[in-house]
UniProtKB/Swiss-Prot annotation:
Subcellular location: Cytoplasm
Source organism: Shewanella pealeana (strain ATCC 700345 / ANG-SQ1)
Pfam short name (any one): tRNA_SAD
Protein name per its UniProtKB record: Threonine--tRNA ligase
Region (Catalytic), start-end ranges: 243-534
Length: 642
């Protein structure tokens, strides 16, 4: 006679074993109709699974985030069902849930086309509309293997052979004639899987190993209702318009090419953005009292062995040799900064020592993972390392947090998710050290009134860390900033200071990054602003255009005056209609479009309009220059208003 305790504390007693669906029906027909699964004593279970003992139960519906994840997983099975109907020769591999959707990896000799994807989506819709029930059957390992062997499903057999113990009882989910294997849970009925769309197809190696066969990966998205699906598709459409690769080409900011995969060729305007971003961070470094240093691009293998990178990171490092010595191109700056710290005797009075570098780093990322500016092989880190005593950790971390928030706010990023990763199972140091380290990070976050989520066991082996994830205008998450405590590297590389009692002590090292990679952050900014950069950041801040040749000398005079004020100005003296010029520079997202005719020339004025088409009227040259300089100095996100 199980007693079921619901989230509101109420209890229901049953005379026999019950399922989540039974409990939902006992509460009411509406809940039974909406029930997708249950969380029984903290564990997700299928709606049909029997509860035999007293238990806590939460009923999962499509209104719950977990419910949406479950229906997405079931949509992957629905996709498998459709694939096997249209392409019976297909061998099914894996079909997991991902952010906002799902995918299925399949082995099919026929290369899927867009027409095939459309046909699969249509068949999925036809199947889902029948509202067929999903039948879960728990079987022996051997029965599961026999089932897939009889169907020639070699990948399912491999999963059983390599990943599932022979004494286990796998769950097989029957979608009419289609059978799939999964931990579950899944929806009890396909009525929950009505709002989906297949998005794309790509290549993927079996088990992610390039030595294995290349499979086809079909991606899809699924949501609880039509409205949510439409919102997501609209967001994707907007994201496609904002794609930094597309805008980068339109605005002539940079390019990539096959001869240098994952390396950026910055063009004039793109490099202007890069330098302005670097200048901004450099000013922050001065404000927060950092030294700026520059380490070598390559260092001997011996140093990387001492730091531990050679053992744990060598696959991602580019190497070269000369005169019988092996070198590695640096994937990160920290070992070099310890070498600078080690030059000369350091006292406790020298701490904290804050050392920053715009470090040019290289990592041998897999070619298939490269993506414009977002995932590159050559990148510049706004990296810093703070050498301090353990007593100084909290105040230094607190200053880092302030710096992160100051920086993000300048760019208009105000939605920041913060996570604190704590001690992993395998770690250096004793529990007392970790207690102090984690508490210091918690107190620093609390001192700044920062809400944060704790990720147990997700810290590095050498110390806990804070991660800052910003959300852009499309609510996409970008993990950029980190503050990481390191109790290992300084000791490995011989960093010491003379303590107040004249003993030699090892400093604590704080790894700190705000933007992460300048290249990636610029990619984020291009998409956040859709190429319409704030005036302070814009490669060209002002374009001055003449109406006829008579104003050419005056245009030169205006542009030169702006340049004397430090304003990035250019001119357009082409023999084109002024409307054509305005349209062209509007498309190039220049913040301010200035037009001069005979009257403006006579009165030493300019007619000012913004790229948004706002007419600011006529202004004296110095008046406009002063207003713009003030806006630039404040790093305002907005343009001047009428």
């Amino acid at each position: 006679m199980p007693v079921i305790t619901l989230p509101d504390g109420s209890k229901r007693e049953f005379a026999h074993s019950v399922s989540t669906l039974d409990v939902a029906a006992d509460i009411g027909p509406g809940l039974a109709k909406a029930c997708i699964a249950g969380r029984v004593n903290g564990e997700l279970k299928d709606a049909c699974d029997l509860i035999e003992t007293d238990s806590d139960l939460s009923i999962i519906t499509a209104k719950d985030e977990e419910g949406v994840e479950i229906l997405r997983h079931s949509c992957a099975h629905l996709l498998g069902h459709a694939i096997k109907q249209l392409f019976p020769e297909t061998k099914m591999a894996i079909g997991p849930v991902i952010d906002n959707g799902f995918y299925y990896d399949i082995d099919l000799d026929h290369k899927l086309t867009q027409e095939d994807i459309d046909a699969l989506e249509k068949r999925m819709a036809e199947l889902a509309k029948t509202n067929y029930a999903v039948d879960k059957r728990v079987v022996s390992w051997q029965e599961a293997r026999d089932t897939f062997e009889s169907r020639g499903e070699v990948y399912k057999m491999a999963i059983l052979d390599e990943n599932i113990p022979k004494d286990s009882t796998p769950a097989l989910y029957h979608h009419e004639e289609y059978i799939d294997m999964c931990r579950g849970p899944h929806v009890p009925n396909m009525k929950f899987c009505q709002n989906f769309k297949l998005m794309s197809v790509a290549g993927a190696y079996w088990r992610g190993n390039s030595d294995n066969k290349m499979l086809q990966r079909v991606y899809g998205t699924a949501w609880a209702d039509k409205k949510a699906l439409k919102v997501h598709l609209n967001r994707l459409e907007e994201a496609a318009k904002r794609d930094h690769r597309k805008i980068g080409k339109q605005l002539d900011l940079y390019h990539m090419q096959e001869e240098a995969p994952g390396m950026v060729f910055w063009h004039n305007d793109g490099w202007s953005l890069f330098l302005e971003l670097e200048k901004f961070i450099r000013q922050k470094l001065g404000q927060y009292t950092y030294q700026e240093v520059k380490g070598p691009l390559m260092m001997d293998r011996v140093l990387w062995e001492r730091s531990g990178h050679w053992d744990k990171y060598s696959e991602a490092m580019f190497t070269t040799s000369s005169e019988n010595r092996e070198y590695a191109v640096k994937p990160m700056n920290c070992p070099g900064h310890v070498q600078i710290f080690n030059q000369g005797l350091k006292s406790y009075r020298d701490l904290p020592l804050r050392m920053a570098e715009f470090g040019c780093c290289h990592r041998n990322e897999p070619s298939g993972s490269l993506h414009g500016l977002m995932r590159v092989r050559g990148f510049t880190q706004d990296d810093a390392h703070i050498f301090c005593t353990e007593e100084q950790v909290q105040q230094e971390v607190s200053a880092c947090i302030k710096m992160v928030y100051d920086t993000y706010e300048t760019f208009g990023f105000n939605s920041i998710v913060v996570k604190l990763s704590t001690r992993p199972e395998k770690r250096i140091g004793d529990d007392e050290m970790w207690d102090r380290a984690e508490e210091a990070l918690k107190q620093a976050l609390k001192a700044n009134d920062i809400e944060f989520e704790i990720l147990p066991g997700e810290g590095a082996f050498y110390g806990p860390k804070i991660e800052f994830t910003l959300h852009d205008c499309l609510d996409r998450a970008w993990q950029c900033g980190t503050v990481q405590l390191d109790y290992a590297l300084p000791g490995r590389l011989g960093a010491t200071y003379v303590a107040e009692d004249n003993s030699r002590q090892t400093p604590v090292m704080i790894h700190r990054a705000i933007l992460g990679s300048l290249e990636r952050f610029l990619g984020i900014l291009i998409e956040e602003y859709a190429g319409k950069f704030p005036a302070w950041l814009s490669p060209v801040q002002v374009v001055v255009m003449n109406i006829t040749d008579k104003q050419s000398d005056y245009v030169d005079e205006v542009v030169n005056l702006f340049k004397e004020h430090g304003i990035r100005a250019t001119k357009d003296l082409r023999n084109e209609k002024i409307g054509f010029k305005i349209r062209e520079h509007t498309l190039r997202r220049v913040p301010y479009l200035l037009v001069v005719g005979d009257q403006e020339m006579e009165n030493k004025e300019v007619a000012v309009r913004t790229r948004e088409g706002v007419d600011l009227g006529k202004m004296q040259i110095e008046e406009f220059a002063t207003k713009l300089k003030n806006q630039i100095s404040l790093r305002s996100l907005n343009l001047l208003e009428d």
